Amino acid sequence: MDLARKAGDRCYDPSTNRCLISRDTFWYAISLLFAGTEEQRRRGRELFATVTVDDCTHTPATLLAVLLRIPDALDDSLRTHLEGAVSQALGDAALVEFHDGNVNHPLAAYATLVLGGERSGQEWAVRLGTRRLRAFRERIGDHRSRYRRQAEMSEYNSLTYTALDLWFLALVAEHARTEEARRLALFLEQRLWVDVAMHFHAPSQQFAGPHSRSYHEDSLGGYSGLHCTMLAAFDDPLFLDPGLCERFDHPSALLQNSLAAILAYHVPDEARDIAWRKPFPYAFRMTTYGESYHENSRRETSHGSPSENSPFAFDDEIYPGGWTDLTTYLTEEYALGSAALPYVNAGHSDCLMARIRRGQKIKKLSDFRSIYTRGVFNGAEIGEKNISHVAHTPVDRSYLYEEGRSAVYQHGGTAIVCYTPKRAGHAGVTGFRLDLIFGFHGPFDDLVVNEQPVGALPLSLGSDTLICFRDYQTFGMIRPLPPSPAAGQHPVRLRHSGEFLLLSMVNYDGPPRDFSRHEINSWRTGFVLELATAQESSWEEFQTRARETHVTEVVEHGIVRTVRYTSGGTTMEFSYDPFKEVILSRRWNGVEESPNHFEVEAAGNRKGPFCPQMLYGEELMS
């Protein structure tokens, strides 16, 4: 509550009577109801009485949480006022449906319909919310094609938005009077806790990837809405650094704690055991299904005066949806996760995420490291305010907009990562690069480039660069794929940027140029990342093996990319069409790998208490 209240004190604007937006203002108001002085509590009640509801999802669900969880903090007139605001939101909430994309807003709408309908006697809303909860469960758990069955929801493993999913499901599970709605919400909440627990890497106290949507604190690690929700629900100690939200100008991530703190959660014992006691190595693959994407926003972004306002949009492009799969591999020392193909437009997705523990206990940011990627146009810089080139929209410091399209083949601790620029950025290009981003609150124990220890930075390197690092008990090797086109003879660059270390693979860096969408879609870049532990070999042996690795890339008909990587007697081969965004083949030692539903392996076992057989399927409902 203190985190939320202090953030609200900083953000509150007396001229608008708001903290950012109405939802966040109500989160601030909740925190004031628990403050130490009557003046603060009175101010909280005033905010509830005077701020209007601007949406039909998060905000009315928040008001319902207040009415259901802390009714004694309100007087009769204020409770009646909030009941009326929720009732007025029901009509618009009825228009919100799940379409294989965003999950948190539909779940908030369904909570509003069920609970708001029950409280106001509007049975149509209860029936509709229950029916949509049922359809949501059926879609994410039972959706099938000829070769695949869906295992994971579309907006998966987001350290911000998965937390919201848990809140709204927990609220319905605890308070719905309608038996089917309560049963569905409880099932979904508890299975989502199992999902969260599978991704939790207890040695680093971070969540393994991939992540459908991430803000900087989510990607960097050390604080997130999901960390805070897990802390509230599990009551096990976790390292948190809320200062990251101030560094990256993301106060909502602090304000929301007031809502997370007042809810009742229903964590199954299975999830607690998997989270904290899973054996290593722990590996899982799961299918998911996402909507196709087309830019359709008509909202405007304010720049100070109406004449300077600009449309708020995302990518002016169409991206195919459909099936893809997610791979996660955890050892005692590190966790590596990847998405074979992006989540929708991948505005701020982590298609690849590595978490490395750097100490026996996690007490500060330098005790772990995160590694992830972004493709960026025109000099966009991590941790700073930018103009997204593909969206033509200002982006604040809370996230770095993803301006590339990715495809990843991961097997165990090794990943082949292919990137191409987003077609929407084809005009007015002054630069495009792929950044492999390292959190850098502490140096590597060893960092070696082309067999030489790294001294002063920055470095400009050739495409055939070999990079090895030692981080506590984890060893890593990176081989860039030669960028095509390449920005000069030394298109690989290593440099510091604030609290980050960036390994950049640069396709273009020069005067403004316009390209056709087809031409820029043919640009290519990427890298191979291989991780290992000190339990597998010595640092010297790892470097020797890294020098003997080999990577090649062949492009057929100017379209299909095939990357072949050999290491220590094993071979990975990855074929991908970046124009259609279709993976054609993934072979490990010549054997095709194509996940069709859900598979878990815990220390070599595929059955047992740490190996759920599915997440949301109908078979588990009984």
Where in this protein do the model-derived segments appear?
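Extracellular polysaccharide-recognition and catalytic grooves
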Residues: 60, 65-66, 80-299
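Ser/Thr/Asn(+Pro)-rich, low-complexity disordered segments
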Residues: 1-73, 77-96, 108, 132, ...
